[in-house]
Curated annotation (Swiss-Prot):
Protein's recorded name: Tachykinin-like peptide-III
Subcellular location: Secreted
Tissue: Expressed by the venom gland.
Keywords: Pyrrolidone carboxylic acid, Secreted
Residues that bear Pyrrolidone carboxylic acid: Q1
One cellular-component annotation, GO: extracellular region
Lineage top rank: taxon: Eukaryota
Family indicated by similarity: Belongs to the tachykinin family.
């Protein structure tokens, strides 16, 4: 699963 930059 890739984490989006919005997951910050």
């Amino acid at each position: 699963q890739k984490k989006d930059k919005k997951d910050r």
